[in-house]
Amino acid sequence: MSNQSKLNSAAYDQLNKDADRILHLIKVQMDNLTLPSCPLYEEVLDTQMFGLQKEVDFAVQLGLVDKEDGKQLMLRLEKELSKLHEAFTNV
């Protein structure tokens, strides 16, 4: 595996770890702290998603992650968060 491939893989792995960290953070927040309708929940979610999107954009600009892969990562996280939100509000 070339150095560039290793860098690309490491960048994508790190972005996935960050996405998983956000999902975990929101799960903990919903389970223990606040309701999805709480402004604090929305603020944390918006801030975390904005930060991850900036990470993805940066990795794409450096050529470490394909633009479409970055979009798919964000879509996957948004879908998982949406499912989590639905499950929490339908309980």
UniProtKB/Swiss-Prot annotation:
Coiled coil: none annotated. Belongs to the UPF0358 family. This is UPF0358 protein SERP0701. It comes from Staphylococcus epidermidis (strain ATCC 35984 / DSM 28319 / BCRC 17069 / CCUG 31568 / BM 3577 / RP62A).
